[in-house]
A protein has these predicted regions:
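Short, low-complexity disordered leader/linker segments with a strong preference
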Residues: 1-34, 65, 100, 420-429
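Beta-alpha junction/loop-to-helix N-cap segments that form part of ligand/metal-binding clefts
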Residues: 21-24, 28-30, 47-51, 66-151, ...
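Immediate post-signal peptide segment of exported/extracytoplasmic ligand-binding proteins
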Residues: 24-37, 65-73, 182-188, 355
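Extracytoplasmic "Venus flytrap"
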Residues: 29, 33-57, 79-89, 112-113, ...
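Short, polar/charged alpha-helical segment
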Residues: 48-69, 205-210
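Extracytoplasmic ligand/sensor domains, especially the bilobed periplasmic-binding protein
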Residues: 105-222, 271-296
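Extracellular/periplasmic periplasmic-binding protein-like sensory domains
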Residues: 260-334, 346-351, 416-427
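Segments of small-molecule ligand-sensing domains
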Residues: 316-330, 341-408
Length: 429
């Protein structure tokens, strides 16, 4: 899952779209192509999904305002995969089936959650339907690792790869926080709590392997996702173990941050750490009065650390000016949608300027090299991964003006925001 990151200036983004995707203006419009979106957008999950949706909408607006690509304009075909406020794999599959049933939808942005991607990829792969996730971080979606309980080739069922992502993976994100906890926070003994999901278990595993390699010790417990509301027995066990911190592998809609709200009452008030699943406004809200000293990673670079970021962030905030319209993966979604539209433009050009097939779009997307996006230049490999390996670390703090923050801020306590602390670049380490 990543936070707002910057691009080269907005006008350059439009120029690159023209150069890589075909003509952006002139001639008569040939019709409208739909970009599917599947994200969790209701209930507790909305704090992650809606800002991500806005990133896609902003990318579509940017391309359309520049005249479209190869005579085509674009529109968003949006689907919510949340059920009762939490992401739902079956709903995600239904959404993808609906997209595939609409011949105007040539690819999709999403899903947000790795468990949903695991369920959707087999359906989309059979239709040669491009998926680009702005936030999936479970490595097993693309990498056949010894620790994986499933295999990427099985998800694709013998079909060519149709799945791509613009973030790095938990086999980098987990170790980054392990290093930060051990070296920066001086935590040598830690509690590890997992929500038992594809994402939560995977990132907790990656964290604890690295933490142990550094010389730390840990105690691990798992809980059953969104059905868990009382964490006091877990916290008491961790306290008795002597843990100096708590790392949670999970997401806010699976109650990962409810545990934070119960730590003081159990006398276990230590630093709270996790992955991008807790880098949300909902997490800060769920933590209640114990909303400071929450440490989270994000699977990409921060906007404040990327040259030229300010221009695109300012432009985005003018288009989407709500206090919670900028989320952890807004700009990744912008990049993902721009990459997809450019691939569609190239496919149309190669098809004589005509509407391309989904397979032609898949081929164009698979051939994407040197795509200049908001957080850097992307080159996708045969599995759909990119070569940007940056992980950022954030901590919740009280800020003077949330409107100027590039971090995610709380809803109930709007001056509590995630503030950037450090980044790890695993491509150069």
């Amino acid at each position: 899952m990543v936070r707002a990151r910057g691009l080269v200036v907005l006008t350059l983004a439009v120029f690159v779209a023209a150069a890589c995707g075909g003509s952006t203006g002139g001639g008569s419009a040939k019709g409208t192509i739909k970009i599917g979106v599947d994200l969790p957008e209701s209930g507790a999950a909305a704090s992650s999904g809606l800002p991500t949706l806005h990133g896609v909408e902003f990318a579509v607006k940017t391309i359309n305002d520049a005249g479209g690509l190869e005579g085509f304009k674009f529109e968003v075909s949006n689907f919510d995969d949340a059920v009762n406020g939490a992401y739902n794999e079956q709903k995600g599959v239904q959404n993808v089936q609906q997209m595939i049933g609409d011949s105007k939808v040539l690819g999709m942005i999403g899903p947000f959650n790795s468990a949903v991607a695991k369920a959707e990829i087999p359906v989309a792969a059979a239709a040669h339907f491009v998926m680009i996730s702005p936030s999936n971080t479970n490595p097993c979606l693309t990498k056949d690792l010894p620790t994986c309980s499933y295999h990427p080739q099985d998800l694709r069922g013998g079909n060519p790869n149709n799945y791509f992502r613009v973030v790095t993976t938990d086999d980098f994100q987990g170790p980054a926080m392990a290093d930060y906890a051990y070296k920066n926070l001086n935590i040598k003994t830690i509690a590890v709590l997992s929500d038992s999901t594809v994402f939560g278990k995977g990132i907790a595993d990656a964290f604890q392997v690295r933490f142990q390699t550094l010389g730390g010790t840990f105690k691990r417990l798992d809980y059953p996702g969104e059905t868990q509301n009382d964490f006091k027995s877990f916290l008491t066990s961790f306290k008795n173990f002597g843990a100096q911190g708590l790392y949670v592998g999970g997401t806010d809609d699976k109650k990962a941050c409810v545990a934070r709200s119960q730590m003081k009452s159990t006398g276990f008030d230590v630093p709270y750490l996790g992955g991008d699943g807790i880098e949300t406004a909902q997490c800060i809200d769920d933590a209640g009065s114990n909303n400071l000293n929450i440490n989270a990673t994000s699977a990409g670079a921060d906007a404040t650390q990327v040259a030229g970021a300010k221009t695109i962030l300012d432009a985005y905030k003018k288009a989407f000016s709500g206090p919670h319209d900028l989320g952890g993966y807004t700009i990744q979604a912008y990049d993902a949608a721009t990459a997809l539209m450019q691939a569609i433009g190239r496919a149309a050009k190669d098809n004589g300027g005509n509407l391309p097939s989904r397979e032609q779009v898949r081929v164009a997307m698979a051939a994407t090299k040197g795509f200049v996006g908001a957080i850097g230049t992307y080159n996708f490999d045969a599995n759909g991964d990119n070569d940007l390996k940056i992980v950022s670390v954030y901590t919740t703090e009280s800020v003077d003006d949330p409107a100027t923050s590039t971090g995610v801020c709380a809803t109930k306590s709007p001056k509590i925001c995630f503030v950037w602390k450090q980044q790890f670049n695993f491509a150069t380490s």
